[in-house]
């Protein structure tokens, strides 16, 4: 598991204090113990992921690109989503999903993937699970926002900046105003 934390700097009150304040606020709003947060400098994509297991303390890893491109609200949403994944024990299933070779943008813990065929039922179950777990994580992210009504603007802003989520999904040129009208 140590390859997950290579070239990482731990967030704290002295290093990345703005991010540390966001993490504390999200943990408080979700009634969660403050997770460890790392900023990882060796990733080539703007991604965020969380890790937790019986042998690893719950932690969130932000790529340096995410830290540099995101506004405070966008970071609050992303960190809130990862806190939700930790709170709901989604981390193990998320890591299992990475080995399905779902698409080339999916986060992979190391440069290898599962080469054998995966049972169709297992594949379908994990893909469906990801869809519903992501809704739960987004709800946690919305709870963490100072202005939850800004969710659509925050999420479209992230994707329009080139954000690729943990599952490899990306969506450029999202129409914020069109989505807001549909939501009304």
Show where each model-derived region lies.
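Hydrophobic or amphipathic, alpha-helical segments that drive membrane association/targeting
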Residues: 1-51, 56, 120-126, 162-163
């Amino acid at each position: 598991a140590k390859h997950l934390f290579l070239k990482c700097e731990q967030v704290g009150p002295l290093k990345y204090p703005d991010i540390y304040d966001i993490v504390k606020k999200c943990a408080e709003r979700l009634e969660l113990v403050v997770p460890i947060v790392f900023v990882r400098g060796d990733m080539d994509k703007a991604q965020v992921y969380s890790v937790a297991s019986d042998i690893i303390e719950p932690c969130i890893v932000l790529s340096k690109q995410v830290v540099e491109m995101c506004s405070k609200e966008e970071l609050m949403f992303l960190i809130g989503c990862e806190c939700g994944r930790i709170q709901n024990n989604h981390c193990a299933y998320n890591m299992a999903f990475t080995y399905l070779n779902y698409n080339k943008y999916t986060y992979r813990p190391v440069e290898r993937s599962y080469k054998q065929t995966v049972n169709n039922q297992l594949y379908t179950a994990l893909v469906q699970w990801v869809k519903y777990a992501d809704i739960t994580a987004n709800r946690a992210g919305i709870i963490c926002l100072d202005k939850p009504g800004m969710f659509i603007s925050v999420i479209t802003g992230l994707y329009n900046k080139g954000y690729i989520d943990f599952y490899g999904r990306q969506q450029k040129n999202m129409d914020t105003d069109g989505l807001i009208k549909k939501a009304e």
